[in-house]
């Protein structure tokens, strides 16, 4: 049996912030000869995305409990029990040597099933404040890791696994050397866009005139509206796209980013070495604020809570940053990044796997 490849089951679903780091670790271990399967749900993004990466996926039926009403809460124990039974049956068939929980509702029943079968459970928390599933699973996990300090008091800080093309970008002092002309501002609202960015940044452009050039990802279905907003204030020259397929190229182009502060976005911006203005999405638990705080504390970014994200405040901030200041911020961002996060997570998975 010693010649058999090790087996990993990745448990992650729902959003790219959970799925993409899991894929990075999966590919790293597959390159070392590991067999990897995925545990997810059939109605979320992992169902389509994971098979495209050459990884087989098994599904269980589970969804979130927040905001579902009294009936859903009363039915929750039965739903969780059924999902646990499904996950347990899947793991009995695949016989993983270790499971890796990257977040999302699927990790709860999956982690409990693995624990009940004596399979080591490794958790990775991507956000600066722990999600409910990981808070609960941490009590039974073999190892807990975190991307940012503070999610768990005693967990090792390992960063977030990010895409290799972002990690391959030249260092800020190389990439930004010799640049002049207008400051290049990359505006990213995530794949869904962000209304506050779409409404505010054209007005900022009007204030700053030819001192900036903007590349603005608007999100789905509103590209024309945002283009009209720029044109309406006499700034039609700025580039508006619905999506940006090659984020590494966009980061390489930019001098500064204006964006939400999802966990992966923050980690990618740090890895690329870019200054940022972060506008945290207003979650109840302020998850995105806590993600961005380490970069602000390092002098690499400025956080504007949404009510403070005004035309005047943003325009004044951007106007106040010289190229020299932006380079210093970029170097600080890169200095606090953890570029070997994928290797750190994979190493821990290997360490605790059953022999």
From Swiss-Prot:
Entry's Gene Ontology molecular function annotations: UDP-N-acetyl-D-glucosamine:N-acetylmuramoyl-L-alanyl-D-glutamyl-meso-2,6-diaminopimelyl-D-alanyl-D-alanine-diphosphoundecaprenol 4-beta-N-acetylglucosaminlytransferase activity; undecaprenyldiphospho-muramoylpentapeptide beta-N-acetylglucosaminyltransferase activity
Record Gene3D superfamilies: Glycogen Phosphorylase B
Location in the cell: Cell inner membrane
Reaction(s) this enzyme catalyzes, per UniProt: di-trans,octa-cis-undecaprenyl diphospho-N-acetyl-alpha-D-muramoyl-L-alanyl-D-glutamyl-meso-2,6-diaminopimeloyl-D-alanyl-D-alanine + UDP-N-acetyl-alpha-D-glucosamine = di-trans,octa-cis-undecaprenyl diphospho-[N-acetyl-alpha-D-glucosaminyl-(1->4)]-N-acetyl-alpha-D-muramoyl-L-alanyl-D-glutamyl-meso-2,6-diaminopimeloyl-D-alanyl-D-alanine + UDP + H(+)
InterPro entries assigned to the protein according to its UniProt record, in alphabetical order: GlcNAc_MurG, Glyco_trans_28_C, GlycoTrans_28_N
EC class name: transferase
UniProt-listed GO biological process terms: carbohydrate metabolic process; cell division; cell wall organization; lipid glycosylation; peptidoglycan biosynthetic process; regulation of cell shape
Binding site for UDP-N-acetyl-alpha-D-glucosamine: 15-17, 127, 163, 191, 244, 263-268, 288
GO CC, alphabetical: plasma membrane
Keywords, comma-separated and alphabetical: Cell cycle, Cell division, Cell inner membrane, Cell membrane, Cell shape, Cell wall biogenesis/degradation, Glycosyltransferase, Membrane, Peptidoglycan synthesis, Transferase
Predominant place of localization: membrane
Signal sequence segment: none
EC number: 2.4.1.227
Membrane topology, from the record: Peripheral membrane protein
Pathways involved: Cell wall biogenesis; peptidoglycan biosynthesis
Keyword Cell division: yes
Keyword Magnesium: no
Cited Pfam families: Glyco_tran_28_C (PF04101), Glyco_transf_28 (PF03033)
Family per similarity comment: Belongs to the glycosyltransferase 28 family. MurG subfamily.
Function of the molecule: Cell wall formation. Catalyzes the transfer of a GlcNAc subunit on undecaprenyl-pyrophosphoryl-MurNAc-pentapeptide (lipid intermediate I) to form undecaprenyl-pyrophosphoryl-MurNAc-(pentapeptide)GlcNAc (lipid intermediate II).
UniProt name for this protein: UDP-N-acetylglucosamine--N-acetylmuramyl-(pentapeptide) pyrophosphoryl-undecaprenol N-acetylglucosamine transferase
Lineage: Bacteria, Pseudomonadati, Pseudomonadota, Gammaproteobacteria, Enterobacterales
